Amino acid sequence: MKLHEYQARDIVARYGIPVTGGGVAATAEEVQKVAEQIGGPVAVKAQVHVGGRGKAGGIKLANTPAEAFDAGKAILGMDIKGLTVEKVLVAEAITFEKEIYLGVILDRATKRVVLIASSEGGVEIEEVAKINPDAIIKLAADPLLGLQPYQAQELAYSIGITDAKQARQFSSIATGLYRAFVENDAELAEINPLVVLPNGQLQALDSKIVLDDSGLFRHSEVAGMRDIAGEPESEIKARENGLTFIKLDGNIGCMVNGAGLAMATMDVVNLFGGEPANFLDIGGGANAQKVAAALDIILDDPNVKVVMVNIFGGITRCDEVAKGIVEAQKIIKRQVPMVVRLVGTNEAEGQRILADASLTPASTLADAAQKAVDIAKQ
């Protein structure tokens, strides 16, 4: 679950991390009121779950409350990559001398919580990794002891912070961000940028937190922050139907049971020169209704030219999947070619149900991927 910037800002502030003054607003009048309370230049920032809001005109500076009103009026209601701006963060605009990146992630390769820091903040960390990977420093925290203050100070020195007082403050901020990550079951927590003020103090200018949906039952207060209106409709539909769905940029829709098989399917599609349009795991024991819902979600994407179904039936019954496919074809208006591989429990019955449907059968994963890629290229 993604949090808006203003929500992430409130969470990191609870952990002793200094943030800029400001507040959230849903109308231009509220924007002006917050700007008056700040009493100086402000930044009016669109709160949407997509990147590139600055380039889209979703961030504006204002020197007076009247200018803030105009900025709020311009941004609220704006469409940014398909999402409507319903709230803005009105934050104090400050002068700073340097930008730093600080983030916390779960590194599955090392099975550790890892802190990432860079002296090149203010830009996407992925861009820094491409252009100057040596500017990125990583530190793995011990899962039993947690992040130790001396480790955080070493991280500060590693990114060029030489002032002892500043290094101690960085250590405090890094420890706070680490705690925010662990205690809220997050997948990502980052401050970008963490800025150095003219007086040498550090302050978080922008915060981002992504929570693990599987841990939300332990955090009812945070779970209530979910902004359904700010999420893609496809992800909302998937969650309501118990599906795991991630939209990608390709044109080959994928419906698979099991996360591992879904990733393997996407890899094989890439191997044969295709581009998956999504990751979609229908899970174990999926019934016809869930399969139909999955196909409906996939076909909501206008880029999809073909759907590849790859089912290895264990708990999931192939005949139930087949029934769902046939049912979906009856009710879904948009029809595209489908390549179907069914192997496992009730396989023969599933093949019988699909015999009269306008589908392309496949016997192996490689066969299915090749056929799907060939159709997508037509």
UniProtKB/Swiss-Prot annotation:
It holds the Pfam family ATP-grasp_2. GO terms for molecular function: ATP binding; magnesium ion binding; succinate-CoA ligase (ADP-forming) activity; succinate-CoA ligase (GDP-forming) activity. It catalyses: succinate + ATP + CoA = succinyl-CoA + ADP + phosphate; GTP + succinate + CoA = succinyl-CoA + GDP + phosphate. Its cofactor is Mg(2+). GO terms for biological process: succinyl-CoA metabolic process; tricarboxylic acid cycle. It comes from the Bacteria. Binds 1 Mg(2+) ion per subunit. Pathway: Carbohydrate metabolism; tricarboxylic acid cycle; succinate from succinyl-CoA (ligase route): step 1/1. Mg(2+) binds at N192, D206. Substrate binds at N257, G314, I315, T316. Its EC number is 6.2.1.5. ATP binds at K45, G52, R53, G54, I94, E99. Residues 9-237 form the ATP-grasp domain. Belongs to the succinate/malate CoA ligase beta subunit family. This is Succinate--CoA ligase [ADP-forming] subunit beta. It comes from Herpetosiphon aurantiacus (strain ATCC 23779 / DSM 785 / 114-95). The lineage of its organism: Bacteria, Bacillati, Chloroflexota, Chloroflexia, Herpetosiphonales.
